[in-house]
Swiss-Prot record:
Cellular compartments annotated: Plastid, Chloroplast
Family matches, as Gene3D superfamilies: Tetratricopeptide repeat domain (1.25.40.10)
Assigned protein family: Belongs to the PPR family. PCMP-E subfamily.
Source organism per UniProt: Arabidopsis thaliana
Main location as per UniProt: plastid
PPR repeats: 83-113, 114-148, 149-183, 184-214, 215-249, 250-280, 284-314, 315-349, 350-384, 385-415, 417-451, 452-483, 484-514, 515-549, 550-584, 585-615, 616-650, 651-685, 686-716, 717-751, 752-787, 788-818
Name under which the protein is recorded: Pentatricopeptide repeat-containing protein At1g74600, chloroplastic
One GO term describing the cellular component: mitochondrion
Keyword Chloroplast attached: yes
Length: 895
């Protein structure tokens, strides 16, 4: 050992004297800065120990190899373990170099360890993320009879915070307060951190406010805690207080505040913070990454790329944020290009990056790219990660290939399947395969795999059958999962969805502590089935219960006022939000705009819209829709133009709204302008936008443009297929409509009620009576869809156009549901065409009984009677019409 020590020291050009001085300096430095040791003041070093320690710790000498050489030299000189200062210094060097095993061996050789040496071990374990070992050593320290000091408590509380061990944290925190160490800065910051991570932000905030001299680290810890607890208001308030006070924000502060702006998509305030960052010169990689994340989450990818390009050496987080931003913006090809550049840059890719690029490929038009990414994932070994496997399952599900999703799931081992079974159940749900979801859940139980509240909630979200829902309900009662708040909420949502509102309300009442999500879900359930009074009453019950409604609950109540237009109720809710001071949120603002638009109060809707803190496509869409419904097409287009001119990229929902407005206008040029904008931003391939384009051109009478719009859609969905069928039907092209319908079925799509309206309408317009009967029967027999009055209207129209009026009457009388006024009105119109007076009288009488305020039935009957010269009855009909207060709408011309 002596030879080894001499040789090594000579090669490093370190003399024994220098070694002793170095270790002594280390000891003095650590004692003065970290351990508050009384012995540190007694050291009489002939040189500046701070400068010497800093020089050596920043050099190549501060590593494991050097530390072992120094230990060998000190052993040769018999200085270990008898020299306490040198032993502690060497212990600290082992800790700093990351070799805690060697540090533990050295600690065991110390004849009389003290609190300082114990602190070195506890801090070392914590520093190298060996948090459980840090807690064990803290317990060992008490077992050895040493009394912990502020350094001990600060380190062990930080370890508890990282482990998220609430019980042990509680014990240590109580003991810290009892021993009177809570006022030390190192303990205060650790307490703030542990309370924040254990969802006790109020306690963390109290510790912070009680602090006599909070440093920047304490400020950053409380701001990060507020961010972690999604208390964004506290983040901004603390940041403002910090800026006007004596503490100067650093890069960590700016990163936290920018993250809060990104979460709320507060671009305007984020730009203010960015300006302050530039002014202070705090643009490091962490802050720039936070700025990139802000722009990406707000949909401003050009600005995000500009900031990203200025980062000298982007980290893996920086690359991943850019990739995720393009994915969120539906720009999959840019996301793949970023991923390609990232691989060439040499940055180490992590599982978050991989899941982001996989998510970008989750669309029917990117099957080839999805396969290539999957192959790379398999080759690189990332497929062993559960989160990556879950992303692959979701990707194939969204691409429309649920079989490949299932294959990925089956290729996993039991542990991985346990972790992501919820993802598979959700994928089955999105692919409308509830049977497979139920079988998978049953298999989990049979194989002994653990089921939790997430598995049950995923399954309940799939079900639309009350009997199966009751079976799952029974399982939750047996397993005790029914006590979980999310499971209880999912159960009563299922009952509500299946039309069993009474059972749903019973379950709702059985939940002891209802959160806002429960109240909002029950209110939405009442709203869905038209129970306006009950929904509003439930909101009043919530207030009486002492629960303060959040934005989601208030938005649900406003949706009730929108679905069943009730302007007075809506104004009352708006007044409540103003009094409560919660009227500034984007979600609530959008709900208010939608409510006022649906209730016809467009002036108030525009006032709320103009006061929104940020431009919002959802609110814009609601207002455009309101303008369109009330004939203010030009106002809708002006609003759309203002949004585009401001540089805001409209989403598919806003585009669909303006296309519906264009379809209601008489100017095809407006629709063409919108189409040009859609082509420019690349949304023509989106199914929802393509369907709206198709419908617009159909109303303009351009069937060729309808076909072009359909051909541009990447992976047309059922809505797009149905829109094309309806377009052909509207233009009397029955054969083409039926060909599209058959092609749709060949592609694997199952028709719904709306699809059959288009099919039956095509048959009626083409006079295809037998085909109408066939498809009406197919609805029930092949797809289990019960026909509604709108389907029967098409059937009566087909019979009426073919002159089979008595058969149409017999068909109406044998309907499984009560015919409405439109059914009888359709027969009446056919009687007018074929001059069938007596049957026309019967049809008119039925239609007037059902809709006495509809002028159409009176006018049609009057015209039939006039054509056969029965003027007395014409006069009687007109008197009846006048007596009921019905007036014919006057004609108008745009010429």
């Amino acid at each position: 050992m002596n030879c080894l020590a001499n040789e090594s020291l000579n090669s490093l050009k370190i003399s024994p004297f220098s070694t002793s001085r170095l270790l002594s300096s280390v000891t003095n430095f650590r004692n003065q800065l970290s351990f508050s040791s009384k012995d540190s003041s007694s050291s009489s070093a002939p040189f500046n120990p701070f400068r010497f320690f800093n020089d050596q710790s920043n050099s190549r000498l501060c590593n494991l190899r050097t530390t072992k050489i120094l230990q060998a030299h000190l052993l040769r000189r018999y200085l270990l373990p008898f020299d306490v200062f040198l032993t502690k210094s060497l212990l600290s060097w082992y800790s700093n170099s990351g070799s805690m095993a060697d540090a533990a061996k050295l600690f065991d050789t110390i004849p009389q360890p003290d609190v300082v040496s114990c602190n070195i071990m506890i801090s070392g374990y914590k520093q190298h993320r060996l948090f459980e070992e840090s807690l064990r050593f803290f317990s060992k320290m008490h077992f050895l009879g040493f009394e912990a000091n502020e350094i001990s408590y600060g380190s062990v509380i930080s370890a508890c915070s990282a482990l998220q061990a609430p019980l042990f944290s509680e014990l240590v925190c109580c003991h810290t307060i009892k021993m009177g160490y809570f006022f030390y800065e190192v303990v205060e910051s650790a307490l703030i951190d542990v309370f924040s991570k254990n969802l006790r932000f109020e306690d963390a905030y109290k510790v912070f406010r009680d602090s006599l001299s909070a440093n920047v680290y304490c400020w950053n810890t409380i701001i990060a805690g507020a961010l972690r607890n999604q208390n964004y208001g506290a983040v901004f308030d603390l940041f403002h207080e910090m800026c006007v006070g004596f503490q100067k924000p650093d890069s960590y502060t700016y990163s936290s505040v920018l993250a809060a702006c990104a979460s709320l998509e507060k671009l305007r305030f984020g730009k203010v913070v960015q300006a302050r960052v530039i002014k202070c010169g705090a643009e490091d990689v962490f802050v720039c990454t936070a700025i990139v994340d802000l722009y990406a989450k707000c949909g401003h990818m050009a600005e995000a790329m500009e900031v990203f390009s200025r980062i000298p050496n982007p980290s893996v987080v920086s690359w991943t944020v850019m990739l995720s931003g393009y994915t969120k913006s539906n720009d999959a090809f840019s996301a793949l290009e970023i991923f390609k550049e990232m691989r060439h840059s040499g940055v180490e890719i992590n599982n978050c990056t991989v899941t982001s690029v996989i998510s970008a490929c989750g669309r029917p038009s990117m099957v080839c790219e999805a396969s290539q990414v999957h192959a790379w994932v398999f080759k690189s070994g990332f497929y062993l990660d559960s989160s990556v496997a879950a992303a692959l399952i979701s990707m194939y599900s969204k691409s429309g290939d649920i079989d490949l999703s299932e294959q990925v799931f089956e290729d996993l081992d039991d542990i991985q399947r346990q972790n992501i079974v919820n993802v598979m159940i959700t994928s089955f749900s999105q692919s409308k395969k509830p049977g497979k979801a139920i079988r998978l859940f049953t298999r989990m139980l049979q194989e002994g795999l653990r089921t939790d509240e997430f598995s049950v909630c995923s399954l309940l979200s799939v079900l639309d059958c009350l009997n199966l829902g009751k079976q799952v309900h029974g399982y939750t009662l047996k397993s005790g999962l029914v006590l979980d708040l999310t499971v209880g909420s999912s159960l009563f949502t299922l009952y509500s969805k299946c039309g069993s509102l009474e059972e749903s309300y019973k379950l709702f009442q059985g939940i002891p502590f209802k959160d806002n999500a429960c109240w909002a879900s029950m209110i939405s359930g009442f709203n869905e089935y038209g129970y306006l009074r009950e929904a509003i009453g439930l909101f009043s019950e919530m207030l009486d219960d002492g629960t303060s409604p959040d934005e989601s609950t208030l938005a649900a109540v406003l949706t009730v006022c929108s679905s069943h237009p009730s302007l007075p109720r809506g104004k009352e809710i708006h007044g409540y939000t103003l009094r409560a001071g919660i009227d500034k949120g984007m979600d609530l603002g959008s709900a208010l705009v939608n409510m006022y638009s649906k209730c016809g109060s467009l002036k108030l809707a525009r006032q709320v819209y103009d006061r929104l803190p940020e431009l919002d496509p959802v609110s814009c869409s609601s207002l455009i829709s309101g303008y369109s419904q009330h004939g203010l097409i030009q106002d809708g287009f002006l609003l759309f133009r203002d949004m585009v001119m401001s540089g805001f990229t409209m989403d598919s929902f806003a585009i669909s709204s303006i296309l519906k407005a264009a379809a209601l206008s008489d100017e095809s040029s407006l629709g063409a302008q919108v189409h040009a904008y859609i082509t420019k931003i690349g949304l023509c391939t989106e199914p929802s936008v393509g369907s709206s384009l198709l419908t617009m051109y159909s109303k303009f009478g351009s069937i060729d443009d309808c076909c072009k719009a359909f051909s541009q859609i990447n992976g047309p969905d059922l809505i797009a297929w149905t829109a094309l069928i309806a377009s052909y039907a509207q233009h009397g092209k029955a054969n083409e409509a039926l060909q599209v319908y058959n092609l749709m079925k060949e592609k694997g799509f199952k028709p719904d009620k709306v699809t059959f309206v288009g099919v039956l309408s095509a048959c009626s317009h083409g006079g295809l009576v037998e085909e109408s009967y066939f498809h009406l029967n197919s609805m029930v027999k092949d797809y289990g869809i019960e026909p509604e009055n709108r389907h029967y209207v098409c059937m009566v129209d087909a019979l009426g156009r073919s002159g089979r009026l008595r058969e149409a009457e017999s068909f109406i009388n044998n309907m499984h549901i009560k015919p409405d006024a439109l059914v009888w009105g359709t027969l009446l119109a056919a009687c007018k065409i074929h001059g069938e007076v007596e049957l026309g009288k019967v049809a008119a009488k039925k239609a007037i009984e059902l809709e006495p305020s509809d002028a159409g039935a009176y006018i049609s009957l009057s015209n039939i009677l006039a054509e056969v010269g029965e003027w007395d009855e014409v006069e009687e009909t007109r008197k009846l019409m006048k007596g009921t207060g019905v007036q014919k709408e006057p004609g108008w011309s745009s010429v």
